[in-house]
């Protein structure tokens, strides 16, 4: 038995945070003993393992590792035995149990949690962006967006912006109203980043009438007037032609379907919709 300061080497194909957390939690169970932890992240090959174990052997360190690639795990175990080093495989046993329980094969993809974290934060950023630059609140968002949605009121610009945000796409949207000139920023972005949205006037009339009813207002307001709607749609189409952007008629389409068409345009560069 010895009270010498134990040394734990953390070896990981990612950041090594999982193994470090477990190691510190275990070390905390021993009061009065300080544990030295050396973390080596992004280990991808056998040569790197050789170098680490050679150093670890000088301190008779404990090896705690999270390596998802089975070949590297097996190699590390064999080399550690050669150096008479004790090892703890933090991920391997649980991966095997899950595979046995589900009958599925694991992907053995290193650093996958980091990839998922990046996707999550990209989505959060996109949602915050969509809220900040909704309904033309700040035209500067037009220049920062991955896609800019334009159209008259009630053509689903906001719900589409939020749907795209959940896909990690930063979407700004600009309402087109005959009495209000669109921001100059709209004409400064590449036309392929702008999507025009339109609806058949009959459907738009129904949607706006229902909106007024929900708000407790009469349907005789200009907002739901058929002639006014036709005027707005013609004005909007003129702006879209000036921008040179693709136009999607969302009549009869679910949000998911329209969003899918937007993504196709963005990624395939389609012009005619």
Curated annotation (Swiss-Prot):
One Pfam family named in its UniProt record: Kinase-PPPase
InterPro entries, per database record: Kinase-pyrophosphorylase (IPR005177), PPDK_reg (IPR026565)
Residue numbers binding ADP: 151-158
Coiled-coil parts of chain: none
GO terms assigned for molecular function: ADP binding; ATP binding; phosphotransferase activity, phosphate group as acceptor; protein serine/threonine kinase activity
Class of enzymatic activity (EC top level): transferase
This enzyme's EC code(s): 2.7.11.32, 2.7.4.27
Catalytically driven reaction(s): N(tele)-phospho-L-histidyl/L-threonyl-[pyruvate, phosphate dikinase] + ADP = N(tele)-phospho-L-histidyl/O-phospho-L-threonyl-[pyruvate, phosphate dikinase] + AMP + H(+); N(tele)-phospho-L-histidyl/O-phospho-L-threonyl-[pyruvate, phosphate dikinase] + phosphate + H(+) = N(tele)-phospho-L-histidyl/L-threonyl-[pyruvate, phosphate dikinase] + diphosphate
Keyword field: Kinase, Nucleotide-binding, Serine/threonine-protein kinase, Transferase
Domain of life: Bacteria
HAMAP family, per the entry: PDRP
Function, as annotated: Bifunctional serine/threonine kinase and phosphorylase involved in the regulation of the pyruvate, phosphate dikinase (PPDK) by catalyzing its phosphorylation/dephosphorylation.
Family of this protein: Belongs to the pyruvate, phosphate/water dikinase regulatory protein family. PDRP subfamily.
Protein name as catalogued: Putative pyruvate, phosphate dikinase regulatory protein
Organism: Desulfitobacterium hafniense (strain Y51)
């Amino acid at each position: 038995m010895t009270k010498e300061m134990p040394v734990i080497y953390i070896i990981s194909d990612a950041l090594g945070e999982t193994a470090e957390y477990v190691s510190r939690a275990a070390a905390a169970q021993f009061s009065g003993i300080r544990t030295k932890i050396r973390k080596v992240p992004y280990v991808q090959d056998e040569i790197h393992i050789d170098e680490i174990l050679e150093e670890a052997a000088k301190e008779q360190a404990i090896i705690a590792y999270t390596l998802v690639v089975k070949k590297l795990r097996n190699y590390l175990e064999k080399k550690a035995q050669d150096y008479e080093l004790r090892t703890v495989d933090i991920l391997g046993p649980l991966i095997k149990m899950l595979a046995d329980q589900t009958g599925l094969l694991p992907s053995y993809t290193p650093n996958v949690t980091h990839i998922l974290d990046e996707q999550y934060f990209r989505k959060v950023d996109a949602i915050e962006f969509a809220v900040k630059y909704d309904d033309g609140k700040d035209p500067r968002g037009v220049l920062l967006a991955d896609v800019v949605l334009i159209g008259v009121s009630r053509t689903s610009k906001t719900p589409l912006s939020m749907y795209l945000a959940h896909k990690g796409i930063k979407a700004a949207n600009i309402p087109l109203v005959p009495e209000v000139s669109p921001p100059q920023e709209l004409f400064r972005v590449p036309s392929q980043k702008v999507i025009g949205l339109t609806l058949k006037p009959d459907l738009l009339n129904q949607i706006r009438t229902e909106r007024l009813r929900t708000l407790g207002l009469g349907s005789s307001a200009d907002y739901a007037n058929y002639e006014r709607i036709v005027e707005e749609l013609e004005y909007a189409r003129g702006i879209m032609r000036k921008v040179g952007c693709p136009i999607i008629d969302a009549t009869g389409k679910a949000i998911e379907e329209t969003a899918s068409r937007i993504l196709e345009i963005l990624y395939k560069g389609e012009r005619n919709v």
